[in-house]
């Protein structure tokens, strides 16, 4: 529940989440009891079988007056990084979180091939700041984060992905590449454009971020690449294998997903780190000049 959310907005979301059957009935009951004037922001964890009074009670609790656990997952965090953060903040253990992720996946209805994935739900938990009750379980956390991603992927965005010929899995995979490569929102659509351009001409993506992800089975323990790493064969080595990797390499934020859906219309094929962002080029000879300029700066 966000600051300023109306009873109408809350009721529609509860219906979408399957908590209530009728948003209209919920609003009428809420208005009768004055709930529409008492809604407080925060994360709700509603157990199956909860009564409407239980839901009203959660909606009206001032979370600033009760102890809550706050955890932030930056955009681009992997599931492994999320697990470690939860353990570091003593919310749940990393092992329990990853076990809960797997259980949620097994209970879900996903239609992608998971045989080459280290964590099948990589990319499917929305990175954000969450507030949980002190007795929250790993299952609760995974459910809240997965459903938040489902909310972000609106029907309009799903339709747009279909128009582009992308499944949701491919969309999140592409968005995760943009997330890991971009310096900021200003260049996400440009990088997305490069991805589409390379895919269109059957060119290797050659993204270092995907190679790093595959080196340590999704744990991202490596902080730099060696030339020999680019030759090591694994499913996420986009220097060796054409097309998108088999799945997301991180959990993308809203801006990267939007960029993947609405890429910049450009003819760039190359980019390299520049001053405060990336330098993009259409021709390989220009790319080599940009690479040389980057090396000269790092040698200074």
Describe each model-derived feature in a short phrase.
Residues 1-152:
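Signal peptide-directed extracytoplasmic domains
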């Amino acid at each position: 529940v966000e600051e300023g959310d109306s009873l109408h907005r809350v009721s529609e979301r509860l219906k979408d989440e399957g908590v209530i059957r009728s948003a209209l009935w919920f609003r009428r009951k809420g208005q009768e009891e004055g709930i529409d004037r008492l809604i407080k922001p925060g994360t709700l964890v509603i157990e199956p079988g909860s009564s409407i009074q239980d839901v009203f009670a959660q909606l009206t609790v001032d979370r600033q007056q009760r102890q809550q656990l706050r955890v932030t997952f930056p955009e681009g965090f992997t599931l492994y990084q999320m697990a470690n953060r939860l353990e570091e903040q003593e919310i749940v253990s990393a092992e329990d979180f990853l076990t809960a992720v797997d259980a949620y996946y097994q209970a879900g209805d996903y239609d992608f091939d998971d045989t080459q994935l280290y964590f099948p739900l990589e990319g499917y938990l929305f990175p954000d700041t969450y507030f949980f009750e002190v007795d929250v379980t790993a299952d609760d956390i995974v459910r809240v984060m997965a459903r938040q991603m489902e909310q972000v992927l609106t029907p309009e965005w799903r339709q747009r992905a279909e128009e582009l010929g992308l499944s949701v899995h491919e969309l999140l995979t592409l968005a995760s590449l943009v997330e890991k490569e971009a310096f900021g929102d200003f260049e996400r659509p440009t990088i997305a454009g490069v991805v589409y351009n390379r895919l269109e001409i059957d060119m290797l993506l050659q993204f270092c971020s995907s190679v790093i992800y595959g080196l340590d089975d999704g744990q991202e323990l490596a902080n730099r690449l060696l030339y020999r790493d680019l030759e090591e064969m694994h499913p996420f080595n986009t220097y060796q294998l054409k097309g998108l990797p088999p799945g997301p390499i991180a959990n993308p934020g809203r801006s990267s997903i939007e960029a993947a859906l609405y890429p910049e219309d450009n003819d760039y094929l190359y980019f390299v780190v520049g001053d405060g962002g990336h330098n993009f080029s259409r021709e390989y000879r220009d790319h080599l000049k940009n690479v040389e300029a980057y090396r000269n700066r790092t040698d200074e």
